Design a protein with these regions (language model features):
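FKBP-type peptidyl-prolyl cis-trans isomerases
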Residues: 1-255
Length: 255
């Protein structure tokens, strides 16, 4: 009898998927699909995505659907708002004085940052800006058409896959005595993005590979190599940051 491997919590798997809302494709791992649907991005990583099952990289309903599926499985899952990006909360809609936005004039659809919250400008009336801090997909049912491509068993391959996924580059790495040793170009120290990525990457390695320590070793080659970093998947860049010194009068936006 042939043994068929099924997905369980803690597994490192690669998946391909297309994400849809109301029949419209909003994300895809296939470059050709993304291009055809007009959602291609130079900053996106295309090809099968690494998922550590149970790590919370996917919405709850999607991740739960993976459990028990065989490697090679293809199918669809429809995820209700409660198990996706949540229901829309009217209390998360606020009115912000327009003078809080110093760098760029707010317009409907703009993503903005206000006091460590990210929201979407929905309306600008006079000197007041309506900002919705709900997730853009809150209240929406999401459909995922996906395929489980492979399971990664080897520890070193898992480490390299985590590095590629979170650092968006391939770095030399090895595992010695329960310690992950990662060689990094010294130029990376100039990038604030890397300072944030390295902490999150180390946490993932220790938690999901069961290693005791992560050592980053600077590599000096004598060549001036400019390392290009991009935002990790799911990160929402702030189009405009509202200044905290000028406070709102507490008025709430209409639902």
């Amino acid at each position: 009898m042939e043994f068929k491997m099924t997905v369980k919590n803690g597994d490192f798997i690669r998946i391909e998927y297309t994400e849809m809302v109301d029949g419209q494709v909003i994300a895809a791992t296939d470059k050709d699909v993304a291009t055809e649907k007009g959602i291609f991005s130079e900053e996106a990583q295309y090809g099968p995505h690494l998922i550590v099952v149970g790590a919370g990289q996917l919405v709850k309903g999607y991740e739960e659907d993976l459990i028990g599926k065989e490697i090679g499985y293809s199918g669809k899952v429809e995820v209700a708002p409660e198990d996706a990006f949540g229901l829309r909360d009217p209390k998360k809609a606020e009115i912000i004085p327009i003078n809080r936005f110093k760098e760029k004039k707010p317009v409907p659809g703009m993503r903005v940052g206000v006091e460590n919250k990210v929201g979407t400008v929905t309306r600008v009336i006079g000197r007041k800006v309506n900002v919705d801090f709900n997730h853009p997909l809150a209240g929406r049912t999401i459909v995922y058409d996906y395929k489980i491509v492979e399971n990664i068993d080897d520890q070193l391959e898992k480490l390299k896959a985590l590095i590629k996924t979170f650092a968006h580059m391939e770095l030399e790495a090895e595992i010695k005595d329960d310690v992950a040793i990662i060689n990094v170009l010294w130029e990376l120290s100039y990038y604030k993005e890397w300072l944030m990525i390295r902490r999150g990457l180390a946490d993932m390695i220790i938690q999901h590979l069961g290693l005791k320590e992560v050592d980053y070793v600077e590599k000096h080659t004598g060549e001036k190599t400019r390392a290009e970093l991009i935002s990790p998947p799911g990160k929402e860049p702030l189009a405009e940051e509202a200044k905290p010194e000028e406070q709102n009068d507490g008025e709430a936006a209409p639902a």
